[in-house]
UniProtKB/Swiss-Prot annotation:
Record-linked SUPFAM superfamilies: Ankyrin repeat, Protein kinase-like (PK-like)
Coiled-coil regions listed: 21-49
Catalytic activity of the protein: L-seryl-[protein] + ATP = O-phospho-L-seryl-[protein] + ADP + H(+); L-threonyl-[protein] + ATP = O-phospho-L-threonyl-[protein] + ADP + H(+)
Keywords assigned by UniProt, alphabetized: ANK repeat, ATP-binding, Coiled coil, Cytoplasm, Kinase, Lipoprotein, Magnesium, Metal-binding, Myristate, Nucleotide-binding, Nucleus, Phosphoprotein, Repeat, Serine/threonine-protein kinase, Transferase
Keyword NAD applies: no
PROSITE patterns associated with the record: ANK_REP_REGION, ANK_REPEAT, PROTEIN_KINASE_ATP, PROTEIN_KINASE_DOM
Record protein name field: Serine/threonine-protein kinase TNNI3K
Residues noted as binding ATP in the record, renumbered to the chain: 468-476, 489
Main location: nucleus
Length: 834
């Protein structure tokens, strides 16, 4: 029994065929080299062969630097049969070789000059003469794919089964290169279809491996070729076409009248089904199972792998794994002779999407494998986690820990190994750290090369002022760069975090440098010289974040101002999603919506963003961004999410903007995400939210991503609401609390135009807006007790409300929101960390 961890990816015959391919490439290169005549020599030779007088005066001993005689040159430079005849009558030998090892006949055959070939043969050239690599003229004709030349040579006595230095016949070569017409001619002249090459490979093996269906049919027709012939590693043709995914050849060979043995094994114990699964050939595997039954499904190779294990080793075709699991003969927790499962195989090769799929479908991560190379008294039992750790697949280690126990049970970088000695493994693993460092260096070098020069900054160009924010990446400063007030996101080195800051930095810069939209934060440049100096510089947005405005400064905005912000954010997101390479933000929340002093908004912070095409495995394995605003499909990691995940987050931001409350403020972020994902709970929609917007909200946070609207539709509907804001405002009955019709029609003008709301101006209307909202609900005694006058102070309004307008956390809430009733019964946390 072999050790799975030492399973070779290439067989001995693979290595041999690679050498054979290289040798034939060298032969072709040498032939081309002989036929490349220098320009000055070529003109002289054209004159010699174009003039009888010049030809008669030329010396028979004439040779080029590459050793070509006049006979060779006649084949290379446009000579004719009379020149050939004359030169040979004068005693020039046709057997003379060039320095590259070829006689004149080989050059004539390679150039497919039938006239010269015939003339040389009639004048005494040896049709069986071997040149470089033991190749005869017939081999050269087969390599070049010249069927007429092949026929002429065979008519003049060439041995149809002659073998070269690697024991390939012309039929081997024709099958290898896919020359169908040459194959037909060779078969017509009696070529042996079952002759073996150096490693026992027949022409049928070669054609099956290369996928030349018509040649396979030519070889098999009339029961000429042995369809069950084995090479030195016991491969049959079905092994090769299954391995390389040639479905049409597999179907042809599995015809009942050909009597192919579909469950035959090679010296490694692999059936054709094993090889199809090792290479992710779903259609081939399905064909084999449907036509031949399930016998191959239960066979183990010498590395303790069934076909299911093989599919997990390949790991990139989950549909194939699903198909195999649907067969009654397959158990997801089947253990090979060494104890390893399909989950072990997937973990060892770093297939994180497959690992998650297997775990979700009942794979047992606590089953252990043993090292077969150890004696029975030295058991080294290892779970799949240890296999992943050994290969440096730290993301899989973290994922397995997540499935093993709640996230907060152990420190984030430790995991107790079950089935082992109880020791802890830390993340990153040694190999994982090396992989990460190598990838990071490559990413930085690539970014430096691709980033336009105008975005390259030196740290000396930046003037740092006060700190305006911080995060796991480092700190954000206000500063000055190139005569602009800017925000500087300064990264710090973090060697203990499994999530690479360098990776995040490179991704964010590569995305920001391609963005240009008034509703997306403007990129100024980045410092790339050294990881210790990494910094991203963007425009400074003076109004701060929407989160700060709503929940720290506790400002109340009128409906028009809210809609202006909502439209701007939707426009920014629409831009991201409509790019040639669409970008998914993945972290859209009120922290990352920044406000100008004029009340407009931009989308910011692209540290978690990805180009949609590059999501691949990362798409399934990360929970990017803030849990409280996370789409269910992202939180559950149950499917490949799309740009519609951003629409869900936007809907929560819109609700937050309209109500002034944090979504599920009574819950921790993870609990809020779990409630939305698993219990389909959504924030309550109060009467203060206009009906057109409430309808948009419900569609935006639809559990099914396909049911959510595109941002283009969101923009259109919100702009309609903005133009009709007077008709939707709860306070529209009192003109003192709303904008004039003319100003509401200005809402679609370009930024900075007249009639714009100003965040600073809104602060003076804070108490008035609250009073207007409270007055509009005086008919609802359950919600509001004492009537509140517009001129009352914040403290007086708090005392006058049955349910506090400003709670103990300092948040102002919609008095009609059902969240009040819930929050009074639940004490919760406003912590918004991941």
């Amino acid at each position: 029994m072999g050790n799975y961890k030492s399973r070779p990816t290439q067989t001995c015959s693979d290595e041999w065929k690679k050498k054979v391919s290289e040798s034939y490439a060298i032969i072709i290169e040498r032939l081309e080299d002989d036929l490349q005549i220098k320009e000055n020599e070529f003109q002289e030779l054209r004159h010699i062969f174009g003039s009888d007088e010049a030809f008669s005066e030329v010396s028979l001993n004439y040779r080029t630097e590459r050793g070509l005689s006049l006979l060779h040159l006649c084949c290379a430079c446009g000579g004719n049969k009379s020149h050939i005849r004359a030169l040979m009558l004068k005693g020039l030998r046709p057997s003379r070789l060039t320095r590259n090892g070829f006689p004149a006949l080989h050059l004539a055959v390679y150039k497919d000059s039938l006239e010269l070939i015939t003339s040389l043969l009639h004048s005494g050239a040896d049709v069986q003469q071997a040149g470089y690599g033991g190749l005869t003229a017939l081999h050269i004709a087969a390599i070049a794919g010249h069927p007429e030349a092949v026929e002429v040579l065979l008519q003049h006595g060439a041995n149809v089964n002659v073998q070269d230095a690697v024991f390939f016949t012309p039929l081997h070569i024709a099958a290898y290169y896919g020359h169908e017409q040459v194959t037909s001619v060779l078969l017509k002249f009696g070529a042996d279809v079952n002759v073996s090459g150096e490693v026992g490979d027949r022409p049928l093996h070669l054609a099956s491996a290369k996928g030349f269906f018509n040649i396979v049919k030519l070889l098999v027709e009339g029961n000429k070729a042995d369809v069950n012939a084995q090479d030195n590693e016991d491969h049959v043709p079905l092994h090769f076409c299954s391995r390389f995914g040639h479905h049409n050849i597999v179907s042809y060979l599995l015809q009942s009248d050909l009597e192919v043995q579909p469950h035959v094994i090679n010296i490694y114990g692999d059936t054709p089904l094993h090889l199809a699964c090792y290479n992710g050939n779903f259609e081939v595997a399905k064909e084999i199972v449907h036509v031949t039954g399930t016998e191959s499904l239960t066979k183990e190779n010498i590395f303790s792998e069934t076909a299911f294990h093989s599919a997990c080793t390949y790991g990139k075709n989950i549909d194939l794994v699903k198909f195999l699991l649907d067969q009654n003969a397959v158990n997801i927790n089947h253990r090979g002779r060494d104890g390893h499962t399909g989950l072990h195989s997937a973990c060892y090769h770093g297939h994180i999407r497959l690992v998650q799929f297997l775990l979700d479908n009942g794979a047992d991560m606590n089953l252990v494998a043993c090292d077969p190379s150890r004696s029975s008294g030295e058991k080294d039992e290892q779970t799949c986690l240890m296999w992943a750790y050994e290969k440096g697949h730290d993301a899989i280690v973290t994922l397995l820990k997540h499935y093993k126990r709640p996230q907060d049970e152990l420190p984030c970088n430790e995991y107790s190994q079950p089935g082992g000695d109880g020791s802890y493994v830390s993340v990153p693993s040694p190999l994982g750290k090396i992989k990460s460092m190598t990838k990071e260096k490559a990413d930085v070098l690539l970014l430096r090369a691709e980033l336009p020069s105008r975005f390259h900054l030196q740290l000396s160009e930046i003037e740092f002022h006060e700190i305006i924010g911080s995060g796991s990446f480092g700190k954000v400063y206000k500063g000055r760069c190139r005569n602009k007030i800017v925000a500087i996101k300064r990264y710090r080195a973090n060697t203990y975090c499994s999530k690479s800051d360098v990776d995040m930095f490179c991704r964010e810069v590569s995305i920001l440098c391609q963005l240009n939209h008034p509703c997306v934060v403007q990129f100024v440049g980045a410092c790339l010289d050294d990881p210790s100096q990494f910094a991203i510089v963007t425009q400074y947005i003076s109004g701060g974040s929407l989160f700060s405005l709503l929940h720290e400064q506790k400002r109340i905005l009128d409906l028009q101002s809210k809609l202006i912000i909502a439209v701007d954010v939707a426009k920014g997101m629409e831009y991201l999603h409509s790019l040639t390479q669409p970008i998914i933000h993945r972290d859209l929340n009120s922290h990352n919506i920044l406000l100008y002093e004029d009340g407009h908004a931009v989308v910011a912070d692209f540290g978690e963003s990805r180009f949609l095409q590059s999501l691949d495995e990362d798409n399934m394995t990360k929970q990017p961004g803030n849990l409280r605003w996370m789409a269910p499909e992202v939180f559950t990691q149950c499917t490949r999410y799309t740009i519609k995940a951003d629409v869900f987050s936007y809907a929560l931001c819109l609700w937050e903007l309209l109500t002034g409350e944090i979504p599920f403020a009574h819950l921790k972020p993870a609990a809020a995400a779990a409630d939305m994902a698993y219990h389909h709970i959504r924030p309550p929609i109060g009467y203060s939210i206009p009906k057109p917007i409430s309808s948009l909200l419900m569609r935006g946070w639809n559990a099914c991503p396909e049911g959510r609207p595109e941002f283009s539709e969101v923009v259109r509907k919100l702009e309609e609401c903005l133009c009709n804001v007077e008709l939707m405002s709860p306070a529209s009955s009192n003109s003192s609390g709303s904008l004039s019709p003319s100003s509401s029609s200005d809402c679609l003008l370009s930024r900075g135009g007249p009639g714009r709301s100003h965040v600073a101006a809104l602060r003076s209307r804070f108490e008035l807006e609250y009073a207007l909202n409270a007055r509009s609900y005086t008919g609802w005694p359950q919600s509001v007790g004492t009537h509140t006058n517009p001129g009352l102070s914040l403290e007086e309004m708090n005392r006058g409300a049955q349910y506090s307008a400003v709670d103990k956390y300092g948040y102002v809430s919609d008095p009609m929101s059902p969240m009040h009733l819930h929050s009074r019964r639940n004490s919760g946390s406003f912590e918004d960390g991941n």
